Amino acid sequence: MTTKPRSEIQIQAEAYQWLHNTHPETRGLCFHVPNGGSRNAIEGMQLKASGVVAGIPDIIFLWDGKAYGFEFKTASGHVSPIQDKIHKVWQSNGVPVYVVRSCEEFQYHIGEILSSAANKPNTSCVGV
């Protein structure tokens, strides 16, 4: 019996729930901005006028004063041309964007982000 391949939304939901449950200190700092799906022309124009931008990564994670983007894809999924363009804009502005294909890959990147912030030297002014 073969298992059905996991969809992008299933991978994303598993990753988000893992972070939410494993690292409660990140709650409110990891979120999804709905910017995809099918809409009628009027709703699409309203969303675009209010700031919805195609190609934004699926998950935005804020930590230690930095932003990170996570784009979820299946094993055979590809980044669209508009996603590639937005990812390059973010990266050229110092915002890393990771394309992840599993919850485990997401966990790895989050672990790296959290541990690098934890190992950062304290540069705050004490006693000034």
What kind of region is each of these model predictions?
Residues M1-V128:
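Catalytic phosphate/metal-binding cores of nucleic-acid and nucleotide-processing enzymes, i.e., regions
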